[in-house]
Amino acid sequence: RINGAEWDGYRYGMNYDSWVRMVDFASEQGFAYLVLDANWYGPEFEKNSDPVTGEKAKDVQRIIKYGKEKGVGIWLYLNDVAGTNYPIEETLKQYEEWGAAGVKYGFMNGNSQQKNEKTRQITELCAKHHLLINFHDYPVHPYGQERTWPNAVTREYCKAQLDGHQTFEPKTFVTSVFVNMIAGPIDMNNGF
């Protein structure tokens, strides 16, 4: 998340010009993807934040097109509030039509059984609509899902320490990652 960050005399925001700078940087560095994180479609935990027609939907479509021209795929953040309050399949179909590369799905609610079922459903729908998927913020544990669904590239199973403002000690951090990766790929970031 770079919203509000300053670098090289430029203050980044949740806007098209900042996204262009990020795509240009990603392209120059050979990065395949860039994620438009939380709040691009409105305040992420408000039920009326529409993940298809939200605040910056037109700019998102423009940056996806620009990213393709630069060889950078754009992933779109989508959380469980929007995924539950708006038709998930229609949303993912729209992202496919826009040309998005993938979805970072966050803050899934429910008990373990509900989360497992929702993980399977969303992964299958993303595959149907040619989208990669990364489950973020307390998803179900890795279980080899990517064997059936190769579009399920990772999940943040080891807690978003950056968001939680917590840290693991180095030994615990490394051990946790490698033990959990036995079952499948994960992403993890240490906090502060």
Describe the predicted segments one by one.
Residues 1-20, 24, 29:
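An acidic-aromatic substrate-binding cleft motif
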Residues 29-31, 99:
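Short loop/turn motifs at secondary-structure junctions
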Residues 34:
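Structured mid-domain segments that build the active-site/substrate or prosthetic-cofactor binding neighborhood
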Residues 37-192:
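Aromatic- and carboxylate-enriched substrate-binding clefts and catalytic-loop regions
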